[in-house]
Every structure is written in structure tokens, then in C-alpha cells.
């Protein structure tokens, strides 16, 4: 009996040793992610900055965060050993989404900068076309009906048909990134008015990961959107210390009701990786080791 107990104990210890490193990934483990689509949620506080690795190993950014957020963005890109970016998508021109564009382009070679071709309001704040031109990147103005093949992933673009001069957030470009049966829905600062138009005109908005519009505040993320998207994970680009509205109790309760696991811009991690293998998605913490 004692011998059997010892064998059971050894087996348990072996399993613990094998799984001890699970849940975190560092610089030395990034090669294992090739062949997957990976969304890296960079921990910059109130602001949007994401790195997207497509299955063939190419890299895109979805928004850049503020200028002062650049050190954290650079840290993540260094962990990932990124030297070149195939493209940068800017959902709109607010500084907490696009303010870091020039600093990124100073260090990294960027092939293309993707903009909404219908937004003649928010981009004026940062003039991304001039920045792209200065660094030799091609500017691609999207109209909202494109389906882009990007290195084994697909980016389906949606842009609101009517520009909103009263609420600039509702001019945000939305892109659904998909790889086989997995997908990420990136929404910029889309609020409820734009959500309604999106749901009326976008055929299949289901996604495993939903980036909540407008930093998780109560003016976005309607019940109708959650019912249509049916996400497993919800990303909120804000935290209680910097922006209490981002940890809105009503939205938190709504996410819980719909079975959505929420991730905020808080903690010591450099980023959270949402790793899509084409069948399912898992969330893994990225630490600066």
C-alpha cells in the first residue's frame, strides 16, 4: 500500500513539474507560436495597442497606443523578436489609439499603414498619411467591404457608412480577424450607435475574442452585440486606477452573465497572448523575463 502511495505521489509531482511553466510565456518560447494566429494585448493602461501574428509568421499592429506608451510596445515587440511589421491598422485617429505611430515607424520597418477611407475627421489629429510617407510605408485607405488575406489569416473590414461628426468614436474601423474556425473582433472606440449599424450590416460577427469598444465604458458593448458575437474572452483596454469608467460594474456584470472572461489593462505582465490554433483560443500571460 505504501509503495502504491509513493508511486501516486511521484506521478503527481511529475505532472506538476510538466505544467509549472504553463500560463506564462517569455522570449525563449515564442517560436512555438508559429502556425497560429496570435493577438497580443499589450498592457499600456487606457489605450489600445495590439500585435497580431498571422500563421505564416508575419506581424501586424492594431492601433499603437499613446506616444508615452511606446516603451511597453517596444518591450513586447522585442520579446517577440519583431524587426519588421507587415502593416499597422489604425482604427481611428485619437491619440490613445494612434499616438505612437511615428515612434514605432522610427524603429521598425513598416510595409503598409491601413486607414479608414471614410474617416476625414479623426485622422486629422495625427496626420498618419504624412508619417507613413516620411518612412516609406504604403497608405491603404479601406472602404469597409474588403476581405484581406494576410499570411494565412483573413481580415474582414467594416467601416460605418455614415460619418459621425458629433461623436468621433463612432467613426471607428472594425476588423474581424479569422483563422480557420477561430476569430478576433477588433472594434476601436465603437459605441452603441455604431454597434447598431454594425449588427445590421455585418453578416457573421461571431468571435472568440471581443475587444470591447471605448475601453469597456457603459456607452458601448450592448447586450445585442454580445448575443451576436458570443465571445469567450473580452478585452478591456483600461483599468480602475487610470480610468474607473473602464471597470464599469454594469458592463462587468453583463460580461459575466454572457459567460465572457474579462481581461483588463492591469497587472505586471507585458501582454496577454490570445493564441488561436484554428480550432480554439487560449489566453497566456507574457512576462518580460
Q: Where are the regions that the model predicts?
A:
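Non-globular, low-confidence helical/coil segments that flank catalytic cores
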Residues: 2-7, 17-289
